[in-house]
Structure formats: structure tokens, C-alpha cells
């Protein structure tokens, strides 16, 4: 009987330890933060400002405030929407896009050439919801990066048939920054000068939470 007493005590101690561990695991499971399933919708607009006599496309109504700001600060005769990119990103996620599009700059003749495309890339290292110094919730984009390779017409080469063929050189342009914005409020990120005609690419971005 004396030998059974220490064994019984040891078994009771093991059972007590297991009970404490089980309670601890249950409490941890109840207090652990659930995975954030919030998604954000980002919209990137590429607007081209030019003084050339080109057909200016109508800009979306959501960009009216941006257009007023552009006309007040940038002395371009015409503005056209070159691209609209809409993407869905998980909160605290990243985004990376590459695409081939139409010309972003006008040729010296005043018309955008359809012969040579533009190559563009858009990256954001992290998109997340944060609180600003006034405790307002805003969307923060860390590592915002836009880059493009723009075809610039240099001369008109002569083909074997005797017809003129335009010659192009590709020039790189881009912008990198960190920005914050209110939800659903388009903001101008920056402008990039392109081409000998003095055209400019205006980067506008907005972001908002989406329904699950």
C-alpha cells in the first residue's frame, strides 16, 4: 500500500497538469484574433494632359473634382483617359500589374501613333487600413510604384517599297512614393512629363472597402 501512494500522487499530478493545459488552450483559442478578411478595391487612372489638338475623351463623373484641380493647376488644353485599372486586394496585401497598352504620348504631328505600344507596370508593396493622427480611418499604400516605357517617334525611315515608316525609341519614366487617402476619394499621386510635345501622364488613385 505504501508503494501505491506515490504512484497515485504522481497520476493525480499528471491529470491536474493536463487539465490546466486544456483550459489554457481553450482560453487562447477564444482570445486569438480572427484572420482579417477585409478586402479593398483600388482604382488607378492614367490621364494624359496635352496641348495638342486631339480628341479629348470624356472623363468619368467620379473624377470631376480631380479634373477641376487639374484645370486650375496644369495649363493643358485637353485631357484624355488613357487607362483605368480596377483591382481587389486583401487588407495588408500587395499588388503587382504589368500590361501593354496604347500610346501614352502624342506624336510630333499631334496624333497619338497606334504603331508602337506602351509598356507599363504598377506595384504596391502593401495596401492597408490605418488611423491617421486625427483618428480617421484612411487607406495607406506603401511602396506605390508606377513605371512605363514610352515610344517616342524620332524620324521616318524609308521602307524598301519607298513608303515612309516611323522609327521609335523607347524612353522610361516612373514614380515611387508612399501615400495615404480617404476611402473613395480620388487623389492625384503625381505627374510625369513624356514626349517632345510636352504631354504629361497624371496618376490618380482611389481605394475603398468592398463587400465580403
Region roles according to the model:
Residues 12-26:
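Bacterial N-terminal signal peptides
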Residues 1-9:
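N-terminal secretory signal peptides that target proteins for export/translocation
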Residues 2, 29-212:
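Outer membrane pore-forming secretion/assembly proteins and partners of Gram-negative envelopes
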Amino acid at each position: 500500500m505504501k508503494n501505491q501512494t506515490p504512484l497515485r500522487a504522481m497520476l493525480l499530478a499528471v491529470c491536474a497538469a493536463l487539465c490546466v493545459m486544456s483550459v489554457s488552450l481553450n482560453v487562447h483559442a477564444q482570445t486569438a484574433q480572427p484572420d482579417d478578411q477585409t478586402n479593398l478595391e483600388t482604382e488607378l487612372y492614367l490621364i494624359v494632359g496635352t496641348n495638342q489638338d486631339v480628341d479629348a475623351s470624356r472623363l468619368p463623373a467620379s473624377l470631376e473634382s480631380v479634373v477641376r484641380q487639374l484645370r486650375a493647376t496644369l495649363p493643358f488644353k485637353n485631357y484624355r483617359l488613357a487607362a483605368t485599372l480596377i483591382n481587389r486586394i486583401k487588407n495588408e496585401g500587395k499588388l503587382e500589374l504589368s500590361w501593354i497598352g496604347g500610346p501614352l504620348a502624342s506624336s510630333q504631328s499631334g496624333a497619338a501613333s497606334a504603331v508602337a505600344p506602351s509598356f507599363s507596370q504598377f506595384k504596391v508593396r502593401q495596401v492597408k487600413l490605418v488611423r491617421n493622427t486625427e483618428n480617421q480611418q484612411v487607406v495607406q499604400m506603401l511602396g506605390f510604384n508606377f513605371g512605363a516605357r514610352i515610344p517616342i517617334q524620332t524620324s521616318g525611315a524609308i521602307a524598301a517599297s519607298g513608303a515612309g515608316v516611323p522609327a521609335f525609341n523607347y524612353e522610361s519614366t516612373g514614380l515611387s512614393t508612399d501615400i495615404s487617402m480617404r476611402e473613395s476619394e480620388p487623389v492625384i499621386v503625381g505627374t510625369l512629363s513624356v514626349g517632345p510635345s510636352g504631354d504629361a501622364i497624371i496618376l490618380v488613385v482611389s481605394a475603398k472597402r468592398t463587400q465580403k
